[in-house]
């Protein structure tokens, strides 16, 4: 005996909805093979020791961070970084204050991480996450872990196989699991926003 699924209308006065009305308008494979996903999969952020070994002025920092974040431009709020944002991050203690108006590796690493985490967390929560992470890891280890997990998670999410993402932490801790969860939340949002835009949605 064949059972036909029926879609229940929102109310008695709603127009009847047929099952075909809620079929996906785009097949997943078409999305995965799209230019949007191809661009996302080009994301390759620098590791800590690849960040500039000379200090940069604020405008140079903005240009540098925006360049590396560009593959994510379709699924992050724009602008991703501005002079006033940097000033605010310094003011609340998220980023160490510049020395003679110049920013070094640790500050640039912080700014890149903030650009990612602020997409899914309020700034106060990002600060709390940094404070927790600092209990177990130095700045280079913490930054490289974020980048490793982000790149691996994006490649896993935006592929047909969607294989599980290995945890690259040298030692899995509660702190590393929190960071991994934050990265996962960002990638989930990136997937949703990019898929909607592929379907014609413009925020």
Give the residues covered by each predicted segment:
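Intrinsically disordered, low-complexity regions
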Residues: 4-7, 14, 19, 53, ...
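Non-catalytic recognition/regulatory regions in large multidomain proteins
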Residues: 2-35, 47, 74-75, 174, ...
């Amino acid at each position: 005996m064949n059972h036909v699924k029926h879609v229940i209308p929102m109310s008695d006065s709603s127009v009847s909805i047929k099952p075909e009305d809620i079929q996906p308008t785009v097949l997943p494979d078409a999305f995965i093979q799209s230019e949007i996903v191809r661009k996302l999969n080009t994301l390759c952020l620098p590791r800590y020791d690849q960040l500039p070994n000379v200090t940069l002025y604020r405008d140079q920092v903005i240009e540098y961070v925006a360049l590396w974040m560009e593959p994510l431009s379709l699924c992050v709020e724009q602008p991703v970084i501005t002079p006033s944002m940097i000033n605010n991050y310094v003011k609340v203690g998220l980023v160490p204050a510049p020395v003679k108006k110049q920013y070094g590796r640790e500050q640039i690493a912080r700014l890149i991480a903030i650009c990612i985490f602020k997409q899914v967390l309020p700034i106060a929560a990002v600060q709390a996450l940094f404070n927790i992470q600092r209990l177990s890891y130095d700045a280079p280890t913490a930054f490289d872990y974020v980048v490793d997990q982000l790149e691996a998670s994006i490649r896993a999410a935006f592929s047909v196989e969607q294989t599980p993402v290995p945890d690259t932490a040298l030692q899995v801790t509660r702190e590393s699991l929190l960071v991994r969860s934050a990265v996962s939340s960002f990638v989930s949002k990136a997937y949703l926003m990019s898929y909607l835009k592929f379907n014609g949605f413009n925020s």
